[in-house]
UniProtKB/Swiss-Prot annotation:
EC number: 2.6.1.105
Functional pH dependence: Optimum pH is 8.6.
BP GO terms, sorted: biotin biosynthetic process
Species per Swiss-Prot/TrEMBL record: Bacillus subtilis (strain 168)
Protein name: L-Lysine--8-amino-7-oxononanoate transaminase
Length: 448
């Protein structure tokens, strides 16, 4: 049966963000999971070192979450949210508003983080039209930014490897610099931050009359390599958006729900977004639910008699699905009863200490961390910061070695991403970092 399943997967499946030639050479099929480990069809266990793409909170098969889904199944699995609502979607909306930045008063459900961002872009665009400023149609995106894979989200993204092929499909956006301290000329966080803010201020000064919104990941640029923003940068962006009357869209899809040691990462700098996208950890990693938060001011710009054509015409079939909302409610109840955010903040200190051990490795150039979002950047030369040639695929080789040693993750180029489930114990964190260290050492030693 094992061989048969592998052959079927090779014959029929097309996996996301995967060169299928690589999969054919190194196939993997997961069968089950318990706690922070998953098991493949051969019975081998692996630490879930990237939280099943940055979303698992409590581990796999958390009884309370399993039971919440079963209980909701006894009532109804799904009904539409078009023109009506349902019980768990309504209850979840109230809970989400209670835990979100105080100026956000409305939630719009969707199925993925990319769609949540797409919705935010469309809301921002239509907001200005609805209030009589249709000339504000353009967007500012951050260099190296990533917001998902729909055409709108790609248009405000800036990762060449992912996005260049779709250039003719994308709408044009202005690109603003982001402080990548390790690769900056000075290497000084304050200087790097201030220079980037000056360039953003100049861009806004020249173009604010045509700009609807700025989109930015919250505190950490994830897909570009776990780039942690220097203190004061996100707050500085908020101040500039306010000064130049530009909406601020904050992407909390990866960073939200405790991942950075705050419920939402923008809380680190007391930033109040105009629109905010969230997803991933909202259901504890169980079902696909996402949400776009909006201020009351934005909501009211759409609230009018139907004939005035201010309705927000967006929505998908499974928006506000009861099973997803029910498990999200239980997930957030566990956040409170188990003090998840406080625990992550405390365990992050232990994790920081553990990660410092990687600095001793000759090809680890930089280690970046905010909460349970971590990245180790591998370089050919630690002294010059020279990267490995892309065709060496060092990050990919390290991830395969980690799999062999009993831990799953996915590299971001030559940055080894480490985003463990929030429920990971200190002992489990120590074991996972040890696997990272061994894999990096073994692979880079062979590449010298």
């Amino acid at each position: 049966m094992t061989h048969d399943l592998i052959e079927k997967s090779k014959k029929h499946l097309w996996l996301p963000f995967t060169q299928m030639k690589d999969y054919d050479e190194n196939p993997l099929i997961i069968e089950s999971g318990t706690g922070i480990k998953v098991k493949d069809i051969n019975g081998k266990e692996y630490y879930d070192g990237f939280s099943s793409v940055w979303l698992n909170v409590h581990g796999h098969r958390k009884k309370e979450l399993d039971d919440a889904i079963k209980k909701q199944l006894g009532k109804i699995a799904h009904s539409t949210l078009l023109g009506m609502t349902n019980v768990p979607a309504t209850q979840l909306a109230e809970t989400l508003i209670d835990i979100s930045p105080k100026k956000l008063t409305r939630v719009f459900y969707s199925d993925s983080g990319a769609e949540a961002m797409e919705i935010a872009l469309k809301m921002a665009f239509q907001y200005w039209k609805n209030i009589g400023k249709p000339e504000k149609q353009k967007f500012i995106a951050m260099k190296n930014g990533y917001h998902g894979d729909t055409i709108g989200a790609v248009s405000v993204g800036s990762i060449e490897l992912f996005h260049h092929v779709y250039g003719p499909l994308m709408f044009e956006s202005y690109k603003a610099p982001i402080p990548y301290v390790y690769r900056s000329e000075s290497g000084d966080p304050d200087e790097c931050r201030d220079q980037c803010l000056r360039e953003l201020a100049q861009l806004l000064e020249e173009h604010h009359e045509e700009i609807a919104a700025l989109s930015i990941e919250s505190m950490v640029q994830g897909a570009s390599g776990m780039i942690v923003m220097p203190e004061g940068y996100l707050a500085g962006v908020r101040e500039l958006c306010t000064t130049y009357d530009v909406l601020m869209i904050v992407d909390e899809v990866a960073t939200g729900f405790g991942r950075t040691g705050k419920m939402f990462a923008c809380e680190h700098e007391n930033v109040q977004p105009d629109l905010m996208a969230a997803g991933k950890g909202i259901t504890g990693g169980y079902l696909p639910i996402a949400v776009t938060f909006a201020t009351e001011d934005i909501y009211k710009a759409f609230y009018d008699d139907y004939e005035n054509l201010k309705t927000f015409f967006h929505g998908h079939s499974y928006t506000g699905n009861q099973l997803g909302c029910a498990v999200a409610l239980e997930n957030l109840a566990l956040f409170e009863s188990e003090n998840i955010v406080e625990q992550v903040a405390e365990k992050s200190k232990k994790l920081h200490f553990l990660l410092q051990d990687l600095h001793a490795l000759p090809h680890v150039g930089d280690i970046r961390q905010l909460g349970f979002m971590c990245g180790a950047e591998l370089v050919r030369s630690k002294e010059t910061k020279e990267p490995y040639p892309a065709d060496r695929r060092i990050g990919y080789k390290v991830s395969l070695k980690m799999r062999e040693l009993g831990m799953l993750t996915r590299p971001l180029g030559d940055v080894i991403a480490f985003l463990p489930p929030l429920a990971s114990t200190a002992e489990e964190l120590s074991e996972m970092v040890a696997i990272m260290k061994q894999a990096i050492h073994e692979v880079t030693s062979l590449e010298d």
